[in-house]
Amino acid sequence: MQVLVRDNNIDQALRVLKKKMQREGVFREMKMRSAYEKPSEKRVREKAEAVRRTRKLARKKLQREGLLPSPKKVARAR
């Protein structure tokens, strides 16, 4: 993974690198590989993830069709 450092601005380069790693799923992969996961636990986790994905897709579809109200956006103070 490569990040350009402009004008010796290392803070910005680190932010860009972290964002790229997050998008690629590197942090999640490192967390998953930090300890051994038994095959039975892996099956359970993958099944739960699949259920979560299908529920999310169904919820998004209902929101698009107007049957469910869309989530309210919360304004955050910066």
Curated annotation (Swiss-Prot):
- Signal sequence extent: none
A GO BP term here is:
translation
Tell me if Ribosomal protein is a UniProt keyword of this record. yes
Using the UniProt annotation, give all residue ranges assigned to the region (Disordered).
58-78
Q: Which Gene3D superfamilies match?
A: Ribosomal protein S8 (1.20.5.1150)
Keyword Hydrolase assigned to the entry: answer is: no
* UniProt keyword annotations, A-Z: Ribonucleoprotein, Ribosomal protein
- One Pfam entry for this protein is Ribosomal_S21
GO cellular component assignments = ribonucleoprotein complex; ribosome
Identify the domain of life. Answer: Bacteria
A GO MF label: structural constituent of ribosome
InterPro entries xref list: Ribosomal_bS21, Ribosomal_bS21_sf
Describe the family membership recorded for this protein in Swiss-Prot or TrEMBL. Belongs to the bacterial ribosomal protein bS21 family.
Q: Which HAMAP family match?
A: Ribosomal_bS21
Protein name from the UniProt record? Small ribosomal subunit protein bS21A
Q: Which organism is it from?
A: Rhizobium meliloti (strain 1021) (Ensifer meliloti)
Which gene holds the coding sequence for this protein? rpsU1
